[in-house]
Swiss-Prot record:
Species of provenance: Buchnera aphidicola subsp. Acyrthosiphon pisum (strain APS)
Annotated EC: 3.1.3.15, 4.2.1.19
Cytoplasm found in the keyword field: yes
Lineage: Bacteria, Pseudomonadati, Pseudomonadota, Gammaproteobacteria, Enterobacterales
Protein name: Histidine biosynthesis bifunctional protein HisB
Keyword check for Repeat: no
Residue span of region Histidinol-phosphatase: 1-164
C-alpha cells in the first residue's frame, strides 16, 4: 500500500542549527522550532508517516562524538514521543561531503526501503537547505523549504492539509456550469454563489457544521427555474466529497446526530458505497426565500447518489426556513463525524469500500 510520507530534515527544520559549530552535541543546544510539535501531531492524526533524514557531518569521529550526539538526539525524540509524535524511520548519514558516500542527501540510497511505499502525489520533503529540495526532485515528490518567517511549521501544515483530502470538479451541461472545490480538513470561510440566495445560506450552514471548506460557483438556467441549479450542485458536491475522501482508510464511516430546537431533525449516515436516501420532511409553502422547497429532498438525493452514501434524514417543524436549515445543519454535523480519520484500517470486513 502506498503511504503519505513526510521526509523531514532535522537541524534547521525540526530544531535550531547552531550557527557556529552546526552540531547539536548537548541538550543545552537543543531548541525546537516554533509550532513543530503541534504541527507534526496534527499531520500524524491525518495518517502521514514521518521519516527523519539528516546529514550529520563526521558523526562518530573525534570532532563529533557519537555519545554527544546521541544524548541530545534521544532527548529530542523523547520530547516528540511524549506529545504523540513518533518517527517511522530515522535515516542518518555520518559522512563528510568530501567522502563522496552513497548515502548523503540529496542521494536516495538511505530511502531505498521506502521507495515502493511512497504516495508520490501526497508525500513531501521538508527542509531548510537546497539539498532537501534536490532530494525532493530525486524522489519526484514536492519539496517544501522551511523558512522561519514566511514558511514555518504553521504555514507548512496548512499547505499540506489544504492539499490532503481535497478535490476540484467542474461540470458543464447545457443547463448549468458547476465548479466546486472542497477541503475536508481545512476550516476556513467558504465562498458560495449558486444564484439562489437561500440555497447559498443553506450550503454555508452545511460547510460550517461539517468543518469542510467549500468553494462553490454555479451558473444555471434560473430564468426557467431552480431545478437544474440545485440538482447539479448536489451531484457535483457529492462527487467532490467522494473524490476528496480518497481510499477511505481510517475513515470513521458512520455518523448520527439528533439536535433538538424549534425544528426537530435527525440524521444517520453510512459512507457505504451503496447510495440510498430515506427523507422525511414536510413544508408548508412552495418557496423558502428564492428556493423551491420541493428541491430540498432532490438536492440530498442528488448528493447522496453521487457521493454513494446511505442517508436517513428527517425533520419536522412549523417554520419552513428553520426546518430546512435544521436539515442542512444536522447533515453537516453528521458528515463531520463520518469523515473523521481514526487509525489506518479500512472500516469494512469486505476489504473494499
Amino acid at each position: 500500500m502506498k503511504n503519505k510520507i513526510l521526509f523531514i530534515d532535522r537541524d534547521g527544520t525540526l530544531i535550531d542549527e547552531p550557527i557556529n559549530t552546526f552540531q547539536v552535541d548537548s541538550i543545552n543546544k537543543l531548541v525546537f522550532k516554533k509550532y513543530v510539535i503541534s504541527s507534526l501531531r496534527k499531520l500524524v492524526e491525518l495518517d502521514y508517516k514521518l521519516i527523519m533524514i539528516t546529514n550529520q557531518d563526521g558523526l562518530g569521529t573525534e570532532s563529533f562524538p557519537l555519545q554527544d550526539f546521541s544524548t541530545a538526539h534521544l532527548f529530542m525524540l523523547s520530547v516528540f514521543r511524549s506529545e504523540g509524535v513518533i518517527f517511522d524511520d530515522i535515516l542518518i548519514c555520518p559522512h563528510f561531503l568530501d567522502d563522496d558516500c552513497v548515502c548523503r542527501k540529496p542521494k536516495i540510497k538511505m530511502i531505498e526501503p521506502w521507495l515502493d511505499k511512497i504516495d508520490l502525489k501526497k508525500s513531501y520533503v521538508i527542509g531548510d537547505r537546497d539539498t532537501d529540495m534536490q532530494l525532493s526532485n530525486n524522489l519526484k515528490i514536492k519539496g517544501i523549504k522551511y523558512k522561519e518567517d514566511i514558511c514555518n511549521w504553521l504555514h507548512i501544515t496548512k499547505y499540506i492539509i489544504k492539499h490532503n483530502r481535497y478535490a476540484e470538479i467542474i461540470r458543464r451541461t447545457k443547463e448549468t456550469k458547476v465548479s466546486i472545490k472542497v477541503w475536508l480538513d481545512l476550516e476556513e470561510t467558504s465562498k458560495i454563489d449558486t444564484g439562489v440566495k437561500f440555497f447559498d445560506h443553506m450550503l454555508e450552514q452545511l460547510s460550517v457544521h461539517s468543518g469542510i471548506c467549500m468553494n462553490i460557483s454555479v451558473q444555471g438556467d434560473l430564468d426557467i427555474d431552480d431545478h437544474h441549479t440545485i440538482e447539479d450542485t448536489g451531484i457535483v458536491l457529492g462527487e467532490a466529497l467522494l473524490q476528496a475522501l480518497g481510499k477511505k482508510n481510517g475513515l470513521s464511516r458512520f455518523g448520527f446526530y439528533l439536535p433538538m430546537d424549534e425544528s426537530r431533525s435527525n440524521c444517520i449516515m453510512d459512507i457505504s458505497n451503496r447510495p440510498y436516501l430515506n427523507f422525511k420532511a414536510k413544508f408548508n409553502h412552495k418557496m423558502a426565500g428564492d428556493l423551491s422547497t420541493n428541491m430540498v429532498e432532490h438536492f440530498f438525493y442528488s448528493l447522496c447518489y453521487s457521493m454513494k452514501i446511505t442517508l436517513h434524514l428527517y425533520a419536522e417543524g412549523k417554520n419552513d426556513h428553520h426546518c430546512i436549515e435544521s436539515l442542512f445543519k444536522v447533515f453537516g454535523r453528521t458528515l463531520r463525524q463520518a469523515i473523521k480519520i481514526e487509525g489506518n484500517m479500512l472500516p469494512t470486513s469486505k476489504g473494499i469500500l
